[in-house]
């Protein structure tokens, strides 16, 4: 059993976390657009946090090293902190999903404010099992490289990109929904 922790809900690692969507028609009124933009802005997310809900504000948090972690991941846990954001992808693709595109801006701004734009971030990609050995590791690395490319557009110079393949799943792989949750990229900072 996994207890709900804010960091796991924010990163969507907690199994019961769900996204809240704002749908606007193409000809939306300016007030509706303004509300949707404000809700996703730093000021709007500050209100979300103030009211006791889990916001999309990026935070760095330590992760206790565990003996069963892969060696590279355990080293990160010992020396770096994990950001409260996971990048996820469109189904069957290495293209970032709509939330991840906004998260690129949030992460870049967090790193800018923390003075960590240059060679302080590590991207760790994960995936679901594949029949061909090494394919999961390759695909997870390609996803992490896609995130690096987007972060670079916002001035972030990533220190390292790695793919962990199907290690450390956050959901079961027996259904497509679980496999989608496992296809993620974490951000760690020194």
Role assignments for model-derived ranges:
Residues 1-102, 106-118, 124, 145, ...:
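Exported/periplasmic ABC-transporter solute-binding proteins
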Residues 112, 116-117, 126-190:
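Periplasmic OmpA-like peptidoglycan-binding domain that tethers envelope proteins to the cell wall
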């Amino acid at each position: 059993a996994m207890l709900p922790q804010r960091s796991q809900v924010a990163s969507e690692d907690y199994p019961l976390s769900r996204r809240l969507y704002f749908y606007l028609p193409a000809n939306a009124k300016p007030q509706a657009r303004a509300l949707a933009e404000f809700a996703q802005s730093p000021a709007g997310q500050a209100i979300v946090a103030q009211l006791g809900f889990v916001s999309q504000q990026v935070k760095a948090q330590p992760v206790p090293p565990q003996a069963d972690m892969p060696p590279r991941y355990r080293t990160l846990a010992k020396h770096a902190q994990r950001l409260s954001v996971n990048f996820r992808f469109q189904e069957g693709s290495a293209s970032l999903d709509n939330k991840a595109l906004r998260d690129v801006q949030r992460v870049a701004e967090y790193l800018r404010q923390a003075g960590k734009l240059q060679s302080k971030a590590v991207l760790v990609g994960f995936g679901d099992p594949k029949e061909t050995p090494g394919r999961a590791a390759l695909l997870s690395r390609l996803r992490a490289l896609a995130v690096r490319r987007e972060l670079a557009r916002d001035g972030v110079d990533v220190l390292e990109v790695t793919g962990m393949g199907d290690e450390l799943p956050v959901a079961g792989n027996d259904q497509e929904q679980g496999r989608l949750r496992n296809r993620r990229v974490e951000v760690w900072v020194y």
